[in-house]
């Protein structure tokens, strides 16, 4: 087959697709075994499916009293509202209500996660991979060194977290920071409201460093009638960018005029522009980009937006708000997702060594990690040891690291463009146009980013540190 492909020029454009297909051969089983694996598909999904039923349907949290004295029913959706409350009592009550409920089912959650880990080992051993980690990285042809390097580099810079949490304590006026204080707002939210037209103009202004071609195409997309802007009866919540190969991207928004809505526009249009250029410059079979690359373009736009708003803020308070947005992106994406990635690595290592993944083992492993990542500046309350039980991504193993590498690459792209590094803008446009025409690391190498061996992750951590210093100065 390979010889036939070589001799047939009409098939040349399918080179990568065939190469990617043929390299799977060593992990394909004889027919009877493949049939068995196919029949086991539903069995392999039992842990994840049961987790979702338990977490979404059966798990109930005790009611809490909100800031106005009203009794409210806590759930996974509104927890994020109350854990960010300005009222510390509300934050603590929400934290304890949530994790006490997980504590009641910790043995069940442990059994489900253990089942998922065992499934990973069964599949990876059966298909002759060296480990579940290498099996998960194989599809994107990711070097295991990147996964380990990410964890190592973030670990080497955890003093940033220590500084950030110490500053949090000072700004909030606390004697000590607990886990229920970690999401408390450090600065007052801005009161500005935006019309959709104003929001579009702000996003366009913020993204001007991406050049005339990008901006002109962005304006065309805004004017294309492909964006469903406002909330409406029976409309689903959230936001996303979607479409197919021979159409413009379609974007769903639920715009309400807040800055977070403006940020959502920048984020989703980042995905849309990535799709627009990939569909334009790649054949259909190479036009879809993998998850490893998907969050880069959207995060680039968010960083540019926060940077522009920070530079053009009218007050110190407003500038502090945008800087804090960026800090929280670093903390929750670069650091937190790396902590999750390290937890996954640790529990698979424990399983391989024959350790039984009981609730106690999982809780102790997670609590030790939490203490390491937050340092002495935060009290790692005992209940936080149960956080692993509520993370659905752990049932799609070795996935979350992609969020951390995504923000790291985005930081490098933004820095290079702002520093007017030779070829930086052209390289970014080339990246947006590459789709899935090669493996993710190869696509990045072609545009000057060797994330496995260069300083991409270090630069992101440096940007985190610099943003923290700037935030310190303005909040003195």
Language model feature labels by segment:
Residues 1-189, 200, 474-476:
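A well-structured
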Residues 19-23, 141, 170-180, 265, ...:
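C-terminal, non-catalytic "cap/extension" segments appended to globular domains
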Residues 167, 171-219, 223-226, 274, ...:
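Long, K/E/R/D-enriched contiguous segments that form extended
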Residues 191-196, 244-266:
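Short pre-active-site segment immediately N-terminal to the catalytic Zn-binding motif
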Residues 192-194, 227-247:
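Catalytic zinc-binding patch centered on the HExxH motif and its immediate surroundings
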Residues 205-216, 242, 271, 275-283, ...:
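Conserved helix-loop functional segments at active or binding sites
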Residues 263-264, 275-299:
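Post-HEXXH active-site segment of zinc metalloproteases
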Residues 269, 293-306, 406-407:
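An active-site-proximal "capping" alpha-helix that borders the catalytic cofactor pocket
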